[in-house]
């Protein structure tokens, strides 16, 4: 066995490993020569040699192994199908109203430029019934947050803390809807006055707290609603068709007067503006009606007296 593989340590059996005497020197000349010679006399171990730990056998490499090398077994190839998320339109179909609304609001918050795209896709104002439905839901949420108390029915500071978030949500929603329901967003002034009166009545139904400072947001909203009344009345003053509908003017003037009395003068400015426009319109319409009547009489006299006056007035110039 070669040395690279290793060899056996220790003494061989049958006395082959014993040191021979001088008389036994049939195959070797002496002990020293026998120790240095390995021809015909086996392995002779010196007496002073100590047996140590066996040498570790090293592992043979692939090149040293005999025979052909066995190739590794390759796994079979299969078409693997992996999971994938739903498409966006499928996710939207599976969302309910609350989840879809929350997702859109988060998307707008992350990408503010999306607001312009939404305005382009939804250019028209929704149906007025949608406004009323939304505002009534917000108002109901305000009353749902009123804490129950057995000792007192009054709205104290603790109740304001509980209701503050719902109150701000309702007031902001009210102003947003009112601003979307007046010109130039809409051209129907009669519908605008109707919805503005509805929003003012709804604001009057807001709870009134014991501490006046807790009514701060409500009072600020009254000021904003009063400015919206001013704006809408100015738009109505330039619309002859709306001013000609006297019953509608008197109806909303009466409602605005009632709102001013209920709120102790919070609508004084729009009420005075309404009276001014009504007076100006009445002042302009009465002389105009008299002038039209006199002009008609003069034209009739000229028609009866002289046929040339018709050519002078140009009444028949455009008649085929």
From Swiss-Prot:
Pfam name, any one: Cut8
GO annotation (BP), single: nuclear protein quality control by the ubiquitin-proteasome system
Main location: cytoplasm
Alphabetically ordered keywords of this record: Cytoplasm, Nucleus, Protein transport, Transport
Subcellular location(s) per record: Cytoplasm; Nucleus
One cellular-component annotation, GO: nucleus
GO molecular function: proteasome binding
Function per UniProt: Involved in ubiquitin-mediated protein degradation. Regulatory factor in the ubiquitin/proteasome pathway that controls the turnover of proteasome substrates. Targets proteasomes to the nucleus and facilitates the degradation of nuclear proteins.
Family: Belongs to the cut8/STS1 family.
Subunit field text: Binds the proteasome.
Protein name: Tethering factor for nuclear proteasome STS1
UniProt organism field: Eremothecium gossypii (strain ATCC 10895 / CBS 109.51 / FGSC 9923 / NRRL Y-1056) (Yeast)
Gene: STS1
